[in-house]
């Protein structure tokens, strides 16, 4: 009997800890009620499903539109992997769409063999959707994207994709700015030349993927001298 009571006490204690932790985690995620977080599903024009978390700060209204940033996680990562980025950006007043890239998390698999180049793993469709003024609280002239690793490649490809579109239409790029983290392989001249987006790059000096970069050895990740970063600055 005593053993059973002790087990019940332990169970209740664990239950209280779980509920309390979940409550405080929710407060942090919503910046103590200042940000509304919703799970969304976008049915894209090509019949796919893009699942994302929409972080909407209370200051974002129809009369006070705010910038939108689409956040793209890296390879084999669901949206929760970059929730810290979404939380911090939304705390600062940005509307954030944190996506599950195609074939990851709850989003559908891609119908394209070039999902980064032609779709940005779903980011392109969401930028188009936002630019069409489907979010009344978003300033469509200030739409940006950021991603890490594979998500960084999506951001680079987005700058190229929407840049080409802007050149054809003679209008401003739908993707105003991109910030690339941990990926420089596609910072090539043939991709950068059509970009019409503001661009920032972050890369670790000893990134584990630096062996694939243009430079070799210890300088492979040195963005002070790397051809990839110099091409970006001079593009």
Regions found by a protein language model. Give the residues of each.
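Alpha/beta-hydrolase active-site loop
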Residues: 81, 113-137, 157
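Short substrate-entry loop that stabilizes the transition state in hydrolases
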Residues: 61-65, 74-107, 209-211
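N-terminal cap/lid segment of alpha/beta-hydrolase-fold proteins
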Residues: 25-64
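Gly/Ala-rich beta-loop-alpha elbow adjacent to hydrolase catalytic centers
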Residues: 147-151, 155
């Amino acid at each position: 009997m005593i053993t059973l009571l002790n087990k019940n006490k332990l169970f209740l204690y664990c239950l209280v800890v779980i509920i309390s932790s979940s409550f405080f985690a929710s407060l942090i995620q919503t910046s103590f009620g200042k940000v509304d977080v919703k799970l969304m599903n976008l049915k894209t024009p090509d019949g796919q499903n893009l699942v994302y978390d929409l972080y909407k700060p209370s200051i974002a209204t129809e009369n006070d539109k705010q910038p939108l940033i689409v956040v793209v996680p890296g390879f084999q990562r669901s949206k929760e992997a970059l929730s810290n980025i979404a939380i911090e950006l939304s705390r600062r007043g940005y509307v954030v769409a944190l996506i599950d890239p195609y074939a990851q998390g709850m989003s559908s698999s891609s119908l394209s063999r070039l999902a980064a180049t032609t779709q940005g793993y779903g980011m392109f469709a969401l930028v188009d959707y936002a630019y069409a003024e489907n979010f009344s609280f978003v300033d469509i002239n200030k739409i940006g994207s950021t991603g890490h690793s594979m998500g960084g490649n999506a951001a680079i490809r987005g700058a190229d994709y929407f840049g080409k579109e802007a050149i054809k239409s003679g209008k401003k790029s739908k993707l105003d700015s991109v910030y690339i983290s941990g990926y420089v392989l596609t910072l090539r001249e043939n991709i950068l030349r059509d970009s019409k987006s503001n661009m920032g790059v972050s890369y670790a000096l000893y990134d584990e993927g630096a062996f694939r970069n243009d430079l070799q050895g210890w300088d492979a990740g040195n963005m002070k001298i790397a051809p990839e970063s110099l091409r970006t600055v001079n593009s």
